[in-house]
Amino acid sequence: MEKKYILALDQGTTSSRAMIIDEEGEVIGVAQEEFDQIFPKPGWVEHNANEIWASILAVIAGVLLKTNISSKEIAGIGITNQRETTVIWDKESGNPIYNAIVWQSRQTEDICKQLRKDGYEDTIRSKTGLLIDPYFAGTKARWILDHVDGAQERAEKGELLFGTIDTWLVWKLTGGRAHITDYSNASRTLLYNIYDLEWDDELLKMLNIPRAMLPEVRPSSEVYADTVPYHFFGEEVPVAGIAGDQQAALFGQGCFEKGMAKNTYGTGCFLLMNTGEKAVRSENGLLTTLAWGIDGKVEYALEGSIFVAGSAIQWLRDGLRMVRQSSDSENYASRIESSDGVYVVPAFVGLGAPYWDSDVRGAVFGLTRGTEKEQFIRATLESLAYQTRDVLYAMEQDSGISLKTLRVDGGASANNFLMQFQSDILGVPVERPENKETTVLGAAFLAGLAVGVWKDKNEIKKHWKLDKRFEVEMKDEQREDLYEGWHKAVKAAQAFK
């Protein structure tokens, strides 16, 4: 049988998905399985790593069954994962010693406070491109080693293994033959030097993480090891591509050249700009991260996150009951010519890049007796575009690269009003692809490159198909007036504490 399909595994925060992708980059079939969220205390979020593994086995079986494709026809497996989520397991038995601590979880705040107190901020920033925050994996590993009896000692003896979710899945799929991660995931741990491309002794000492438990860091596109036959219907299939979800989306969007950027409009927004083979150190509170490593060289990215995006539209629907379903927001916003001076600052959990203000709260400005729900809905959608411009402007300042176009994906990218306004407020075209599953495509493309389904990035580029290009329609003067109003609104919200 000809091996012409790639199986892409997308291990997310609330569910696991498997997709089969053909040589044309088309999705042939999908299977999805949700799993439980564990909330031991307020602000803590954990997953059962064995349940995640069970969900992966279920979706692999499900998608092969659904598509009637044999395991013999799979040329390779690509993995993309929720980043930063951390597992520590027993090397012999393969059992996790504690739940996986999820990227959203704030349970390591005390460890972070101590690191700040000890003056490690500049060291961490200069070596990892990251900030001290419970978000990243290193403090999660420290927390597990602190809270499980005997764990530190066992880790030092080499009896325990650490990994982000990609590492855990590769280890399980290969029957323990490969304990690895890729550059993109390693760069989110607080332990990896993104300039020297190695686990950093000073950082390991800082968190007292034994080197013996760390995975080997490998390129994002490479044959790492084969599946054990009993996990893949009797077949040994190469696991050949890995990238964290946002980096995978950048790759799946075909953002291969320096200066190309993508925005994923999910619950929040994740913006990444490819900065090429040079790491750009941010002066604006953005993260410097590894995008991927292929063919012996690595590329870097700048990353900015917006905390509230799609969740602002959910707030209109569930909190304020202004719309029945999220997609109605487009219709309401399009009925009027403008928001009539109304601004919504959706700082429900503070503001992310480039403000990094965790104390500011949501606010609405410019209401008059004539304000109706259309203006309110439109202003809420516009806030997503303003925040995106804030981050992209910071990226341009840091990198010295002018953005030419923005590629978009994620749920809210289907909103035509929002995408048009995004183009207008940025002053550059916005491109939405036909296939919105860019994260999965990224993982598939990385694996396919390693096993020869696609020859090179140029061939992959041909499989990126445009759904709609939104051209700039707004005059410069109007754009700057609106954006100035947004900044006034943010400043006023920040003053109200």
Curated annotation (Swiss-Prot):
Top-level lineage group: Bacteria
GO terms for biological process?
Answer: glycerol catabolic process; glycerol metabolic process; glycerol-3-phosphate metabolic process
Q: Please list the residues that bind sn-glycerol 3-phosphate.
A: 13, 83-84, 135, 245
Question: What name appears for this protein in its UniProt entry?
Answer: Glycerol kinase
Annotated residues for binding of ATP: 13-15, 267, 310, 314, 411
Pathway, according to UniProt? Polyol metabolism; glycerol degradation via glycerol kinase pathway; sn-glycerol 3-phosphate from glycerol: step 1/1
**From which lineage does this chain's organism come?**
Bacteria, Bacillati, Bacillota, Bacilli, Bacillales
Q: Name one Pfam family in it.
A: FGGY_C
The molecular function terms of the Gene Ontology recorded here are:
ATP binding; glycerol kinase activity
